Amino acid sequence: MKCVASKFNMWLHLGWLLGLLLVLLPLVRCQGWGEPRFETGNVENISLAAYNEAQLQQDVWMVEEMDAPFVLLYINYQGPSEPTIRESPADLDARLQLSEGGRWSIVINRRQDYEVHQRSSLILLAVESTAIPYAIVVNLVNVLDNAPVMTAQGSCEIEELRGDFVTDCLFNVYHADGFEENGIGNSSTNELSFEIGDVAGARDHFTYVPSTVTPSQPIYNKLFNLKVLKQLDYTENAIFNFITTVYDLDRTHSFKMSTIVQVRNVDSRPPIFSRPFTSERIMEKEPFYATVIAIDRDTGLNKPICYELTALVPEYQKYFEIGQTDGKLTVHPIDRDAEQNELYTFTIVAYKCHNRLLNTSSEGAIILLDKNDNIPEIYMKPLELEFWENTIMELPFDELVIHDRDLGENARYEVRLAETVAGVQQTTDSFTIIPGNGYQRVSFTININNATSLDYELPERQTFVLHVTAHEPIEPTHESTQPITIRLKNWNDEVPKFGRDEYQISVPETIGAGELLATVTVTDRDIDDGIRLFALGRLAESLSVTELPVSAEPETNLPLYGFEIATKVGDIFDYDIAKEVIVQLQAEDTLRTAKQESLHQIFSQLTITVIDVNNKPPQITLPRGTMHILENSVPDSAVIIGEEQIAQIIGTDPDTEAELEFSIDWSNSYGTKSGIRAKAETYENCFYIHEEKVNRQRTIGTIRVNPTFPLDVDHEMYDTLFLVIRLVDRNQTILPNTVETVVAIQIDDENDNAPYFDNSTLTVVRSVKERSDSGVTIGNIIAHDIDGPGNNEITFAMEPIDPAHKGWMNIDDNGIVRVEGNRSIDCDIPPIDKVLQNVTISDWKWSNWHVFEIVLMDTNNKQPYHDPFPNDGQVYQFEKIPSNTAIVRVEGKDQDRDVPYHTVSYEINYRDFPQLQRYFEVDSTGRVYVKENNDLLDRDAGLESIMINIVMLDNAGGYDIQNRVSTNINLTLLDINDHTPKLPELAADELKVSENAKQGYIVKTPFAALDLDDKRTPNAKINYYIEEMTPELETPLFSLENIDEYNAVLRVAQDLKGFYGTWTLKIKACDRGSEYEPIIPLTEEPKDNCETRDYELTVEPFNYNTPSITYPSRSAQLRLKYESLQNGRPLVETNGSPLPKFEAIDDDGGIYGDVTFSLTSTNDGEQDHEVFRVDKVDNKTGLLVLENSLAVQPFPKNYSITVIARDGGDRQSEAAIHVVFINMTGEPAFLEPTFDTDFTENEEGRDERRQLPFAEDPKNAGLPPGAETNVYYFIDKTYGNASHLFQLDRVSNVLQLAQLLDREEIPTHEIRIVATNNENGPPDTVLESSPSLLVVRIKVNDVNDNPPVFQQRLYAAGITTNDRVPKALFRVYAEDPDEDEIIRYELVNGTAVGENLQTDGLPFRLHPDSGELTLTSKVQPNQNGYYQLTLIAFDRDDTHNDTVPAKVYIVSESNRVTFVFLNSVEEIDQPDVRKFLAQELTGAYEMECNIDDIDQTTASDGRQAGGSSSALTDVRTHFIQDNQAVEASRIQQRSSNRTFVTVLKTTLRTRGLSLQDVPPLATEALTEADETLQIILIVVSAALAVLCVILFVAFFIKIRSLNRQLKALSATDFGSISSELNGKPTRNVPTTNIFSIEGSNPVLNDNEFRDRMGGSGGGVYDDLSLQSEESDFNDVDRDIFAPKRKESLNPALLEHIRQRSLNPMANGTDKSNDGAPTSNHKKLDETDDELSHRF
């Protein structure tokens, strides 16, 4: 307020005197003040409240962390007094300062921290009077200057398969600026936000939500729970490890924390088979074992797996078993042949043993392999056949089947037939069996294919045996044979007759086999007839009928057929069944007449009386019901059934003379007690059988107690006897004569034994705890009574020996001892160790007793305690107490009985006070001391005092209850100067300064070192120095100045332009510990502690630099595994290690050094980069991952991509790389399928080596040497026929010879190389298309090891006087099998044989290269004979040579024969063709033929006049016989034979030579003049002859034409024969088609046809006749000598002819287009008019 107003108010209210005093005071105080009294110069950070004049108080609010020094406020005072600060907090370091404008200001020299300093301070400012100061209240305003800190409250584990819920994973966020409402800058409440790093989809799965739990110090802490948004899957991610970034208000500060979330596996997935069973082929009738393994897909739980097997066909379940827990599959032996099945399918179900619903199944199958264990079995009905003799038929079998129950080749068999005739077995040609082989079960037929041998008149054929044999071709021992009896039938017409009507005999029932029963005779009047006798009825198969020799009946002399009837087998009669047996006898004759009558059959009977014989064993009949007897029964007591019925055992025998006797077989009898065998001596002979004989065939036996048995029948020894009862027939002579049976006899019990205690129950120790509850079981007492049920029921009673123990325990009827009184047992006061109890046992008849001890067990029911501590446990010590320093001793006590319970142990309560575990321990005596290797008790770390919680406990080492009592000790720590000031670890951003920074620019303020000592002492006050800067400069770039006792400011000392780079400042900070004076004496002298630290200050440049990619390098190839590719997952190199991160360097700072990677395709038009992406890892690295794994193609696909590294300033660099995905399972591959190389033949090639190309292993693509997977090379032995000639180093792939080569034998070889990773060799089979194969073509280099060889062994030629000089006579040719040989020819010598021949020099020259022999001088007419020459061919090095003779004959032209061929010179003039031609002509004419020359046929020869072909070649030859030239006439004479020439042509055509002619010998040469004249005469004669012929032909044709024209001009009657009109024409006439219709007018002119022709000219135009050129009216109006144009005629005459002529040609216009317009000729359509028909 203004001073005047204050004075006026005081005057009015307080009176004059008081008013005067008051007026004087304001006048003094208001003197020199302006309005407002206080103001701020920093309205953004400092605000002032309204001045309170009543209290002389000015409130000031300023934000924290303002750079000191700064002006707090200005004082608008200009008075005479000098303001002073009477009082101010040291933290403010407030000072008065006079500004340039003359105003006073209060300057704060220390930086203020809301979280450290006082939040409200008072400054007393004295202006006019020190007694009445102005109060300036300074309030700090909190600003957001601290980063949040996030910590996890324990581990985080979340169950899977549950979504959208809040977990119990708790996280605490601490913020030093707090969370008070409107507590930050008076503007807003601090708010937190979270960001989850998107690693493995964590951002989609989790979020943070506020927790309902209230944290400690909620102003600074907030708790958050992790919420699951999308359910987790343990199989996809068992652990999430992601970065959580927490931001405070407006994302001002952040904090990153690595968050680990463990997914808890939930039991929800079915098992999966890790070793399934699919199918197996096993041998039948053999067991098979396998193991099936399934694992829990919930791998975190790994629950046990159970197994179950179900056969698809329930009937086959019996063959399969599987272990429920071990998965052991057992297949029992299966008889495939019996089941007739090879495939057995089943399902194996694996399920979790605790939850059957979680299961998975797998289909399995067993395929049985057949075992060849069955032979072919023949099933045949009947086995005997009768059929008519000499008849083609199929044998009438009801069944003829062969069956082999095996499978496959084991079931194949072959069938053959044989026959036994007259006792001799032989192959048969009479029968055939169809088919001849079979498989498994096949029906067969047997046919007669040769009936001539089946002749009844042959005695051996009347009855014979046919054998059917089946055998397996693969196992000859598997064979079966079935004989068939074949009987041939004859015809008959007489009825046979028995000798008697009835036959009677008697036989014993035991008659044996082969015994004669009766002789039967039959007579038959047929001649050559026979009788067969049959025994009919049931015994027919058991009797044999034997035919006796045919004799004559004495009376009638008829054939008498006798038969003996005998037994086939023994024991066919049974007296007890039938005492008399009647057998029907049937006799049948066997002869049929041509009438085909039926066979005659007669009957008789044989009556057999059976005589009884004792031959049957006896039988035993047991009674119904249970047989039993009471134990201890008196002798002769009988075994009974039911209550009193005596058990009777009945023995019978059907034989009449039987003598039966019972007995007991004690050696096979036995007794049991409760199913256990009893000792034989306790029951043996205890019973005997009392017999009562009813008759000889029946005896009754009863089992009785044996009087001679020394013991009693005892139920306690055995409760059941199993007796073997034997019945014997003493009179039976035929064994067996006995029968046995087993009977069971129960031994009944009676109460004859007293109960007794079990031995073990007498020695067992029983105990009970004191204070046990009622009903607690102490133990049980076991007693036995060996009597049976009803006699062994035991009751128990118990009484304590000491009456004081009554009511503590009781016993029930089962012998169980329990606590009776509730918590009534006490063993502590007084101490009691055991209780004695007398237990009595009894049944209804007997009793027994025993005293038992029951031990009492002490319980820990007394609490430990201790005496009080002095000073209530308060202890003082200096901080950092040494180890083993004692703090206090605790003495505990306890009143329990047992030593463990009253022995007190000590421990520190680490559970509730985990901090104590770092510092203290307590020993068994209660001594509390500082532990060994303890954490320092550091007061400067905030531990000014600590409470030690000591726990006393008894029973420390036991497993029972422990009683715990705790007590506290309070320890106060005093400070020592044990900390060196820790210079701050400044972030790079804090030490970065722009290159444009100017002098005085503050780099860091405050620059504060941290000294953990007590800030209230000099131990924490710090001085700062810059000791050194590197690199060194004369003038320092930076300065460091203290701004208070704790902080300094780092400034730029000069402009930084041009000083870009990193500068290291060595800064030293020292505390003032030497000034420290503690309350208690220190153990050491105080001193100052100093620390020096290097700081790197970065002077940030402008963005002058471009990022440089360090990985991958340019043109690098990244080799990645093709297996298990997933989108977004790290890629793996072929060596199994993860692909390194992409990295680039950029020396620029900030965003200019923040590099981001991107990709593009290197090649235009390709999209290789779309398969990948680069995930950013940090500012210099990125991770290459897949964007689309399904589109990835393996090697040889090469992804060409360009990696782009771009910094924040849009500068970028690129690196083109290649990415290949290697299939690590691929085989090596050659780049080319073939390779050519060479080796030298002979010894020269033995030491040669050839490096073959290496195979490219896809697994080695791009690998450096030494890192590749080894590739081995082998020669494929199965390829070609040259592999044995070579050997190959399998590692180096170097090829060398195994055998020497011969190029002349084989010039090239071909082998195949197989590349593989298997060092033991290639696989057995390799696909022909496999790239692992390399075909090596080997050329054999030649060595000059062969001489040249002439193609011919003799060369010959002929020369004449007409031969030109020089003339090539012939060309020699030598071949050298060596390669690239150069042959040199040489004429070495020669001789002349004949007359007048040169002897001094031969007239020949041999070209050394071409081998051509040339005539060098002309042959003289007086020379004759021949030259004998020797020619030599040398090879390149003159190492080898060959010699051949040559002859040159001097012949005349009459000796030369020219053969003309339809071939070119090049086709014939070849050495081999010349040789062939000379040989063939020599052989054909039987004279030596020599070819003189070969030349093209010239036109002057006259043979080309026809111009048929230009490829005619003359081969001039001469023939030599006896060294003399043969006249050509002889050759031409021979050539006149057409057959000879045809054969010769055919022979020559085999080499493509077409012989055309053998010209005759040319006449002798004429003189030149004669020759010219002759030619002229011939030409003139020929011309005259041609003219005569032309004239004759012309006149003949003209006359004929005129005759036709005259005849055509004459008119004939229409329809007459001569007109040939209206009838069938016989010649082509132009008007034939026009006037062929009756009624047409033949006399027409062109006017009538003008309209038809569509123009002004012409009439009917018969183009058909005209085109045929066969019309008789052609050229009828033309002059013979005129040209063929109508214009040549006189126009008047032409018009006259047109008007009168019938010839349409005359009426038509001229068709010539020679200079005239083309006539508009049109062919008439057939439908235009009936006159237009043409044929």
Swiss-Prot record:
Region feature (Disordered): 1701-1735
Biased composition (Basic and acidic residues): 1722-1735
Topology in membrane: Single-pass type I membrane protein
Motif (Toxin-binding receptor motif 1): 1344-1350
Cadherin domain residues: 171-273, 280-378, 379-498, 499-620, 621-757, 767-866, 879-983, 985-1109, 1136-1235, 1255-1350, 1351-1461
Function: Cadherins are calcium-dependent cell adhesion proteins. They preferentially interact with themselves in a homophilic manner in connecting cells. (Microbial infection) Binds to and is probably the functional receptor for B.thuringiensis subsp. israelensis (Bti) insecticidal toxin Cry4B. Trichoplusia ni insect cells stably transfected with this protein become suspectible to Cry4B; cells undergo oncosis, they bleb and ruffle after 20-40 minutes, swell after 40-60 minutes and lyse after 90 minutes. Following toxin treatment in the T.in insect system levels of intracellular 3',5'-cyclic AMP (cAMP) rise 12.5-fold; EDTA but not EGTA pretreatment prevents cAMP increase. Inorganic phosphate also rises 3.4-fold after toxin treatment.
Name of the protein described by the UniProt record: Cadherin-AgCad1
Protein species of origin: Anopheles gambiae
Gene for this chain: Cad1
